[in-house]
Amino acid sequence: ALCIQHSALLTGEIMTPEKLIDLAKEAMMHAYAPYSGFYVGAALLCADGTVYQGCNIENAAYGPTNCAERTAFFKAVYDGHRDFTAIAVCGGKDGVITGAFPPCGVCRQVMREFCDDDFVLYLVDKDGFETVTLKDILPHSFSPKKHMGLD
């Protein structure tokens, strides 16, 4: 169930990209997307091995819609996590993965709030996945260090 986080510390397993992707695919099936029919799932790996899943949650007014990536991050932050290693993201029409969909700009900035340039993203498509870093998708970013004049 989505309310129970997966933890490699409890099971002794190594969280591979493929396992993280499987958790993102599982999360995608919980999306609430009655308007677009576009389902997105994410699985966020914390530095301690805990994984948080998230799905997109649409709203009739569209503005309040929340992306899968932010859902996963917000759940993890609420539980006290601040160190993250990677995220797997998948999406597609009516729950069928149709291509790799990079995070939107708002999600990228949320990631930047908590993650360094080397944070890994696995962008899933129907034939596999592409590995990129946060710096790849958000160069010249506005980070907490820049905000505080430390960068």
Label the model's feature ranges.
Residues 1-10:
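Short, basic, low-complexity termini and linkers enriched in Ser/Thr/Gly/Pro
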Residues 12-22, 125:
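Short, compositionally biased leader-like segments
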Residues 24, 42-43, 72, 76:
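Small-residue (primarily alanine) positions within well-ordered alpha-helices
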Residues 37-46, 122:
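Short beta-strand scaffold segments in enzyme catalytic cores
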Residues 53-146:
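Zn2+-dependent cytidine deaminase-like catalytic core
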